[in-house]
């Protein structure tokens, strides 16, 4: 997710140059394009800016965190951004097609690359490939119900899935070529010299994947993606989303990009990566279980810090703390096989009482002892 946002912001100024050249019926020269390959040139310029790529990536991430509907979140985030007026470069914040979709009730049939630049939270969050591809499809067809777009997001999600599972580049390339029908045998210098601006998914997503395959590290991937020109912010966002999961992101790059990310997106990034950390924690402890995660989610409430109200049967999270911080409330796994967790002080064992068919009676003096008793009975029943 953050890799996509970094690519978007780093590529934003270069995309403006490409668009301006296109309007004048000229092109950015090869020499100008490849300047970004010089590491003395900063990835981020003073006029760098987040764009729709970052906004909609955040929308997908927030939708996952809230178990929402992709269409609803994409529209809400899009409409909120449109209300801000023109972007930093004096342009509309979204393309005409996307704005038209925002203002209609129909399914969009775009074949553009906008679906692929926003998709990275899905393959990062979900574990099983079948589920990843299904979620990818659902997130795509809301606005991009076209075979070229569907195939493009499948390719990006597959690349991220394989990258995060430590597959080698050769295998990633082979899988995408076989399953998505892409020819990834480009020549980098040829792209830098001759690639033309297009937002078509079929003519930009393969190039973005290729730039990742040609890279040596995360920053190199972003620089090479920008160096081919065209829709530079989106290509770099797609490349960055794959590169993040293959290489990781250097801390100095993370620090440098912070001033360019709006606070609400920073908040989503923080919560999304904390959730990923929590999922990894459960897997490492060999207790990853969808039912357990659902239990944590459905029994968690946010409470104001100044309230004296009790929430029986729930975990309690103060103010804007995030769900994943439940790990701090549940530091000890008492029985890994049965997912017994030390939660009596927070849940009052209400759910266990309900499962066992006992009436719930609050007894502050004995609640912990009663909770332990109920947990033992619950485990025996399991």
Regions from the PLM with identified roles:
Residues 1, 72-76, 235, 335-340, ...:
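Alpha-helical scaffolds flanking conserved acidic
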Residues 324-341:
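Short pre-active-site segment immediately N-terminal to the catalytic Zn-binding motif
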Residues 4, 230, 337-346:
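Short alpha-helical catalytic segment bearing the HExxH-like zincin motif
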Residues 274-326:
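Auxiliary, metal-adjacent structural segments of Zn-dependent hydrolase domains
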Residues 21-23, 336, 340, 352-381:
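Post-HEXXH active-site segment of zinc metalloproteases
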Residues 1-277:
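Structured, active/binding-site neighborhoods that engage oxygen-rich ligands
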Residues 8-9, 341, 345-353:
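Catalytic glutamate of the conserved HExxH
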């Amino acid at each position: 997710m953050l890799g996509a946002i970094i690519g978007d912001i780093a590529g934003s100024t270069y995309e403006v140059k490409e668009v301006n050249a296109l309007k004048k019926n000229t092109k950015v020269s090869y020499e100008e394009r490849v300047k970004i390959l010089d590491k003395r040139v900063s990835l981020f310029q003073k006029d760098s800016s987040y764009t729709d790529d970052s906004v909609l990536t955040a929308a997908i991430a927030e939708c996952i965190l809230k178990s929402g509907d992709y269409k609803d979140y994409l529209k809400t985030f899009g409409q909120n951004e449109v209300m801000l007026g023109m972007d930093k470069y004096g342009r509309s914040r979204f393309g005409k097609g996307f704005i038209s979709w925002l203002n209609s009730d129909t399914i969009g049939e775009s074949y553009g690359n906008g679906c692929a630049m926003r998709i990275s939270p899905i393959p990062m969050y979900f574990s099983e490939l079948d589920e990843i591809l299904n979620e990818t499809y659902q997130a795509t067809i809301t606005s991009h119900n076209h075979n070229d777009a569907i195939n493009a997001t499948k390719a990006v999600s597959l690349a991220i899935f394989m990258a995060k599972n430590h597959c080698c580049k050769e295998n990633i390339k082979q899988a995408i070529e076989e399953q998505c029908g892409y020819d990834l045998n480009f020549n980098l210098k040829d792209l830098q010299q001759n690639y033309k601006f297009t937002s078509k998914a079929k003519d930009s997503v393969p190039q973005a994947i290729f730039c990742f395959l040609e890279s040596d590290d995360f920053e190199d991937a972003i620089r090479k993606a920008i160096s081919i020109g065209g829709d530079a912010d989106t290509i770099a966002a797609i490349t960055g989303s794959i590169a993040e999961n293959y290489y990781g992101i250097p801390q100095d790059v993370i620090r440098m990009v912070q001033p360019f990310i709006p606070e609400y997106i920073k908040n989503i990034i923080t919560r999304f990566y904390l959730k990923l950390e929590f999922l990894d924690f459960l897997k490492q402890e060999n207790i990853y279980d969808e039912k357990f995660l659902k239990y944590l989610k459905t029994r968690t409430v946010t409470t104001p810090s100044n309230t004296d109200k009790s929430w029986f049967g729930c975990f309690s999270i103060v103010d804007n703390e995030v769900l994943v911080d439940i790990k701090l409330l549940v530091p000890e796994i008492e029985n890994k096989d049965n997912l017994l967790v030390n939660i009596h002080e927070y849940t009052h064992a209400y759910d266990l009482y309900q499962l066992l068919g006992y009436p719930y009676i609050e007894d502050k003096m004995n609640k912990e002892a009663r909770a332990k008793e109920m947990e033992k009975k619950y485990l025996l029943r399991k």
